[in-house]
A protein has these predicted regions:
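Short helix-to-turn junction characteristic of helix-turn-helix DNA-binding domains
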Residues: 39-43
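Conserved Class I S-adenosyl-L-methionine-dependent methyltransferase catalytic core
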Residues: 2-5, 16-38, 53, 62-173
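Intrinsically disordered, low-complexity terminal regions of plant proteins
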Residues: 7-10
Length: 190
């Protein structure tokens, strides 16, 4: 017998997951077109004002802004009909040196979808998918996602927390950077 309450709860979870999945593409579009940065730099804007500032089509922008506001990624003031990127969201979407800058994470998620045709056969064979065989956008996405954390923490916090590692690196060491995002961490350490 089906428990209706559990079924509705699970369907709600699935709808939430689907909403999150839709956000992947829309965040990537906003990032690629500079919409978050334009809204952050410009401040509160109507659809028409932001469309002009960003050089995008007003109709598509309205749909994008509506989704972003419904997802609480941006704020909307119905009295002024203006959209705003609050400071907390700006740290996540517009300020590249922020320790919580996350557009790269959304590209990582897109890579997971792109990798499905490679991963699916691995379920049968058990052979796995080599790092170098991943979707090409994954490597840039990993670099972009991890760079803020490396920039804000690697030298200042993470390396000093490892006993003796800083001294070894200062003497000169060979480092293998595998799967860490185009050598971003190695460049920061240098």
């Amino acid at each position: 017998m089906v428990d209706e309450a559990k079924l509705h709860q699970f369907v709600g979870q699935m709808l939430s997951d689907l909403g999150g999945a839709a956000s992947v593409a829309l965040v990537r579009i906003g990032d690629a077109l500079g919409l978050y940065k334009t809204l952050h730099e410009r401040g509160p804007a109507t659809v028409d004002e932001l469309a002009a500032a960003a050089g995008v089509n007003q109709r598509y922008l309205r749909e994008w802004l509506s989704h972003q506001a419904a997802s609480n990624y941006i704020a909307y003031d119905p009295a002024t009909q203006k959209f705003t990127l609050p400071p907390e969201q700006a740290m996540v979407f517009a300020i590249e040196d922020s320790p919580v800058y996350m557009p790269g994470a959304f590209s990582c998620m897109a890579s997971i979808l792109d990798n499905q045709p490679k991963v699916e056969p691995a379920f049968k064979t058990g052979a796995g998918v080599a790092w170098g065989d991943q979707a090409s956008c994954l490597f840039c996405a990993v670099a972009r996602f991890f760079r803020p954390g490396y920039h804000n923490n690697l030298v200042a916090n993470w390396l000093p927390a490892l006993d003796g590692v800083v001294a070894k690196l200062e003497k000169g060491a060979k480092v293998a950077d595998v799967g860490c995002g185009h050598g971003v961490s190695t460049v920061i350490m240098a």
